[in-house]
Every structure is written in C-alpha cells, then in structure tokens.
C-alpha cells in the first residue's frame, strides 16, 4: 500500500497545488477537483474497469474510454490528468491519488479526521465533548467518525493520524495483564 501512496503523492500534490492556485479565480475549484477525483476513484475501483485497465495496451484508447465514461464529470483539466496518468500507466492508482488529495485538502483547511471506536453508541453530548477536546488538543477543526465495537467492553478508542488514545476497558485489561507479567 505504501508503494501506491508513493506513486500517488506527486499526482495528488500537483492537482492540489493547481486547484489552490485556480481557487483564487473560482473558490469552488478545490471542491470540484475533489468531486472529479472521487468519481474517477470510484470508476477505477469497479471490477470491469479494472479488467479493462489490465487488458488494454493502448494508452490513448484507455484514456479516451475513461474520459467518455466520465463525460460530464470531468473538465478539461480532469481530462488532461486522465490522459497523463494513462500515458504513464498509472490510472489504477487514482483511488490513492484521491486519498492523498483529501489529506492535502484537510491540511489546507486545518481539518483532522478523528475516528472514535466505542463499545456503545455515543450520544450527541458525548460526541460534542470529544470534538471539543480533540479540537483543543489538535488546534484544528475535527471531523468525527464514530463506529461501534462491542469487544471493547466499555470506553472508547480515539485515533487520528498522529496518535491513539485507548480508553477502552479491553485496553486497560491488556495493559494490566502486561504489567502483571513483569
């Protein structure tokens, strides 16, 4: 997976820099690029498209097919990206390009994705407390993604790109077991 990220990062950075530069003229440019990349990413993930990517040797035919499928979803710059990536045989990394692009956008907008895994459904008050605490700790706006894992027994695990806070009962039991083994 890290190889895909390494390949995708320069494309994502170039698209992001271009989108930010163009956003001086049109404020919605970054969002438009996010939508184009998301659409391309979903298209490329499709099984039939994956088969077509591996079976077609002509990069021009490949690019033209992808562009014709996307028709209204891509502007001229999006089409140029498809042509460039097809020419370099990199269309299969578009999902990774989209993920990297999202990371650049989040950094640009001072956003952080925070995943909360809890033993039970969190109510709105609990979610707001976590958001407030994480915004204070990270000094940026937080987007909270919650999911339930009953194997935690109680408590929650909070994850960002930089760190993990394990406040789950399962985590405490595991730490206690490790201490008792010493």
UniProtKB/Swiss-Prot annotation:
GO terms for cellular component: plasma membrane; proton-transporting ATP synthase complex. It holds the Pfam family OSCP. Its main location: membrane. InterPro entries: ATP_synth_OSCP/delta_N_sf (IPR026015), ATPase_OSCP/d_CS (IPR020781), ATPase_OSCP/dsu (IPR000711). Keywords: ATP synthesis, Cell inner membrane, Cell membrane, CF(1), Hydrogen ion transport, Ion transport, Membrane, Transport. GO terms for molecular function: proton-transporting ATP synthase activity, rotational mechanism. It is found in: Cell inner membrane. It is a peripheral membrane protein. Transmembrane segments: none annotated. F-type ATPases have 2 components, F(1) - the catalytic core - and F(0) - the membrane proton channel. F(1) has five subunits: alpha(3), beta(3), gamma(1), delta(1), epsilon(1). F(0) has three main subunits: a(1), b(2) and c(10-14). The alpha and beta chains form an alternating ring which encloses part of the gamma chain. F(1) is attached to F(0) by a central stalk formed by the gamma and epsilon chains, while a peripheral stalk is formed by the delta and b chains. Belongs to the ATPase delta chain family. F(1)F(0) ATP synthase produces ATP from ADP in the presence of a proton or sodium gradient. F-type ATPases consist of two structural domains, F(1) containing the extramembraneous catalytic core and F(0) containing the membrane proton channel, linked together by a central stalk and a peripheral stalk. During catalysis, ATP synthesis in the catalytic domain of F(1) is coupled via a rotary mechanism of the central stalk subunits to proton translocation. This protein is part of the stalk that links CF(0) to CF(1). It either transmits conformational changes from CF(0) to CF(1) or is implicated in proton conduction. HAMAP family: ATP_synth_delta_bact. This is ATP synthase subunit delta. It comes from Histophilus somni (strain 129Pt) (Haemophilus somnus). The gene is atpH.
């Amino acid at each position: 997976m890290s190889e895909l990220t390494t390949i995708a990062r320069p494309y994502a950075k170039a698209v992001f820099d271009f989108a930010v530069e163009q956003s001086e003229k049109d404020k919605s440019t970054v969002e438009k690029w996010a939508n184009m990349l998301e659409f391309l990413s979903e298209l490329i993930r499709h099984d039939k498209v994956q088969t077509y990517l591996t079976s077609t040797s002509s990069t021009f035919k490949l690019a033209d097919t992808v562009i014709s499928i996307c028709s209204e979803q891509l502007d001229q710059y999006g089409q140029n990206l498809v042509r460039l990536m097809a020419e370099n045989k990199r269309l299969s990394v578009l999902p990774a390009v989209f993920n990297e692009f999202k990371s650049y956008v989040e950094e640009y907008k001072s956003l952080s994705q925070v995943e909360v895994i809890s033993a039970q459904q969190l109510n709105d008050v609990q979610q707001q407390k976590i958001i407030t605490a994480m915004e204070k700790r990270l000094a940026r706006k937080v987007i909270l993604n919650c999911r339930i894992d009953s194997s935690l027994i109680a408590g929650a695990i909070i994850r960002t790109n930089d760190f993990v806070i394990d406040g789950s009962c399962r985590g405490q039991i595991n730490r206690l077991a490790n201490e008792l083994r010493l």
